[in-house]
Amino acid sequence: MLEVGLIFLPLAVHAGLGLRTLAREKLKYGVPKHHHGSDLRQWLQRMSAVIMLVFVLFHLLTMQRWLGGRFDPQHAFSSASGAIWHFWRDLPAAHPVNVLFAQLYLIGLVAVTYHVANGMATGAAVLGLTRTPAAERRLWVICRMAAPALLLAGVVAWVAFAVD
């Protein structure tokens, strides 16, 4: 129940608000009322949100046991690897469909990394947590350093699953 209250509920609220914004403003490039960052960053934020939502839903359906997924906490690595590489259970791991889904996981990982890093810095500016331009720049530096490190960690984990 802890994961529902601390993970799923906040993500569901964030996704719901994001979908409402997306329905209202679409994926158009260059929204004039946006004051924190470039139009490209805002557009990439929306695109990464759509990709990330599909990725998270797919991930939940393939991993979570209570949704029929294959993940087993007692055998975390092998069951996660099996869930990624054997999306279609009766197909071999090297089948093009399974390879495609493994690549989509990598695309989802990139989208999540960008969305979180950009969202943290932009959100802090919008909420007034970075009160000066210097504080905003420092936070951007931290996010720009953390994002590649997180992406590298994710890619290394993905490669570990890929060579299993």
What are these regions (language model features)?
Residues 1-164:
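Membrane-embedded alpha-helical bundles that constitute the cytochrome b-like, heme-associated redox core
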